[in-house]
């Protein structure tokens, strides 16, 4: 017996500790995230990784109420031109540095001053930041900013270690250090991103999974096969065509909630030489009129999604009923093309290698062809596509926006003249004024009037083709418990468990 115990003890010592202690959750992503730096990130899949890495000042509940995360509370001034935020005590960044008011000041200023920041326009009204004491910070605004708290529930509110950010500079996204429950371990491009639970996280008892691996698999069939085989335990943004297979597997579950965002095709209006193809508004209107959105949704997505043409879903109180999804009118589209002097319009549409958008682009190509329009389809990795969009190296590209709890987050950064994500360089001064004023008005009815006016102008200008609103489906193994779906599609790891 003593000999057997000796052998078992030796084996215990030789085997790596994780084989006994760690439980590893593997999540299949639709594509590889861009830089893991909240300031310059714009890819949706990056937000899924940040949910583990980077806590925010605020978060949302499943019913979209804004609640403190790294903050403990806040108070607006009477004129809503300053906000005082109390911070959680005893929080440290993953490098051991303390989280405090000074670090909040550093992060907000970093968002505002970093070249290429996508957060700058989200918090542009923050004029100065006052460190009241170690756990109290006050933002002074140039004018009221109603959607500020909503912005701080996402990347604008994510806090990174000032020490690490200063040391790494523009390479920070390769070795991110935040204040979340999981720390960065490794990234293999197009392979996986690995994070591990932080031993001294202030609320570590709420997180049961020891290690998370995010695995980009662009082909949805392969992603589903990996879930069914057990190689993955969760997959995000399940395609509607895969739902029946998941629902028929007793070892799997799927949840679905209406998304906050929309699927879209930005059209290059004025961003560099490639804008010439679609700079004439009549050509953009023709593209819009040649689309049958209802048929598109039924054909590609089995009717699981909602046809749309606005930056908010028909289920939102801000939806403008005066601008319904237009009926297809091929004759009118041809007339507009003729008036613009391009009866045989040809342009290039860049599409990422993801099944839903690949299949939708083929249907769109056929619809446009019936109006005499040639759409040349070009496949490009999602991150590369977004980088090309930033540079103006596109005529049109197929992307999406996952949506934000406040309507401002769905439109301001894309449609204002100096918006950080206005890749098409659309600029309408009336739209600018309306969207800017909507940021300052707290009354919902008054805000809706402003958004309605902007929506009606944009519907005529067609700077981007908004096509549908998804239901966000998440597939997962029955080994996974404690998962709660959110309308933003982001997986929260608090309370989530993985059975052996």
Question: Predicted regions: what is each one?
Answer:
Residues 26, 100-107, 134-138, 180-181, ...:
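Alpha-helical secondary-structure segments
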Residues 65, 153-207, 211-213, 221, ...:
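Gly/Pro-rich hinge or "lid" segments in bacterial periplasmic/extracellular proteins
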Residues 75, 86, 120-163, 479:
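Surface-exposed binding/hinge segments that line
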Residues 197, 248, 255, 278-366, ...:
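Append "and occasionally in soluble cytosolic enzymes with long acidic Gly/Pro-rich linkers
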């Amino acid at each position: 017996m003593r000999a057997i115990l000796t052998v078992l003890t030796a084996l215990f010592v030789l085997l790596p500790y994780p084989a006994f202690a760690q439980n590893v959750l593997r999540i299949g992503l639709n594509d590889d995230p861009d830089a893991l730096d909240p300031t310059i990130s714009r890819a949706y899949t990056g937000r899924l990784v940040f949910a583990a890495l980077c806590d925010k000042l605020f978060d949302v509940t499943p019913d979209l109420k804004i609640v403190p995360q790294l903050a403990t509370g806040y108070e607006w001034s009477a004129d809503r031109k300053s906000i005082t935020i109390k911070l959680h005590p005893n929080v440290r960044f993953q490098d051991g540095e303390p989280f405090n008011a000074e670090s909040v000041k550093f992060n907000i200023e970093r968002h505002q001053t970093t070249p290429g920041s996508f957060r700058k326009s989200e918090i542009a009204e923050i004029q100065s930041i006052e460190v009241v004491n170690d756990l109290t910070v006050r933002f002074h605004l140039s004018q009221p900013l109603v959607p500020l708290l909503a912005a701080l529930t996402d990347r604008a509110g994510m806090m990174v270690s000032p020490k690490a950010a200063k040391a790494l500079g523009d390479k920070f996204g390769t070795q991110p250090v935040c204040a979340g429950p999981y720390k960065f371990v490794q990234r293999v491009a197009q392979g996986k991103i690995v994070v591990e639970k932080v031993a001294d996280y202030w609320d570590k008892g709420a997180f049961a999974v020891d290690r998370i691996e995010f695995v980009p698999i662009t082909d949805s069939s392969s992603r589903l096969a990996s879930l069914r085989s057990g190689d993955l335990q969760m997959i995000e943004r399940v395609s509607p065509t895969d739902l029946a297979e998941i629902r028929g597997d007793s070892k799997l579950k799927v949840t679905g909630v209406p998304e906050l965002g929309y699927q879209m095709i930005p059209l290059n209006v004025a961003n560099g030489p490639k804008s010439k193809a679609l700079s004439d508004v009549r050509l953009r209107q023709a593209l819009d009129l040649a689309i049958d959105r209802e048929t598109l949704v039924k054909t590609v997505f089995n009717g699981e999604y909602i046809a749309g043409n606005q930056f908010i879903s028909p289920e939102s109180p801000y939806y403008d009923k005066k601008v319904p999804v237009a009926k297809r009118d091929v004759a009118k589209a041809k007339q507009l093309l003729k008036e613009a002097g391009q009866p045989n319009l040809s342009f290039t549409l860049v599409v990422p290698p993801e099944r839903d958008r690949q299949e939708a682009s083929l249907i769109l190509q056929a619809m446009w062809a019936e109006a005499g329009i040639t759409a040349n389809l070009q496949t490009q990795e999602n991150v590369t596509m977004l980088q090309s969009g930033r540079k103006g190296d596109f005529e049109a590209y197929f992307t999406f926006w996952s949506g934000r709890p406040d309507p401002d987050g769905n439109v301001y950064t894309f449609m204002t003249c100096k918006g950080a994500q206005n890749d098409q360089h659309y600029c309408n001064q009336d739209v600018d004024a309306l969207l800017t004023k909507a940021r300052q008005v707290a009354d919902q009815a008054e805000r809706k009037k402003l958004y309605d006016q902007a929506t009606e102008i944009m519907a005529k200008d067609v700077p981007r083709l908004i096509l549908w609103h998804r239901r966000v489906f998440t597939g997962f193994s029955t080994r996974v418990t404690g998962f709660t779906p959110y309308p933003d599609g982001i997986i929260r790891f608090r309370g989530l468990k993985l059975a052996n």
